[in-house]
Design a protein with these regions (language model features):
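Short, surface-exposed ligand- or partner-binding patches at beta-edge/loop junctions that are enriched
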Residues: 61-63
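Rhodanese-like catalytic fold shared by cysteine-dependent sulfurtransferases
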Residues: 1-20, 27-58, 67-103
Length: 103
């Protein structure tokens, strides 16, 4: 499933504790500002944490614009995960343009 960053923003208030926002940008990009509560894991290494991600309700995978999120989401789905939602349209670039909060 693919959603936009706007849709993710709209879902934030109703997110469950079992849901995860997975930011697959570089650690440098992540430290310059990220969605509150997001976890960082580079898109190249997400398959290595697939087993750990099984315990989450829904994992929302995002990046700067959408490309790395799509690659990471495919890798996780290929690892057998069914709880992945790719935030493939917009990413942190749009998040910043909208002036939405970061930490």
């Amino acid at each position: 499933k693919i959603i936009s960053i706007d849709e993710l923003h709209d879902k934030l208030e109703g997110m469950r504790d079992s849901d995860l926002i997975l930011d697959v940008r570089t650690p440098e990009e992540f430290s310059s500002g990220h969605i509150q509560g997001a976890r960082n894991e580079g898109h190249e290494s997400v398959a290595g944490i697939a087993d750990e991600l099984k315990s989450y309700g829904t994992v929302y995978v995002h990046c700067k614009m959408g490309g790395r999120a799509k690659m990471a989401s495919e890798a996780l789905e290929n690892s057998g995960l069914t709880n992945i939602v790719c935030v493939g349209n917009g990413g942190m670039e749009r998040w910043g343009q909208m002036g939405w909060p970061t930490e």
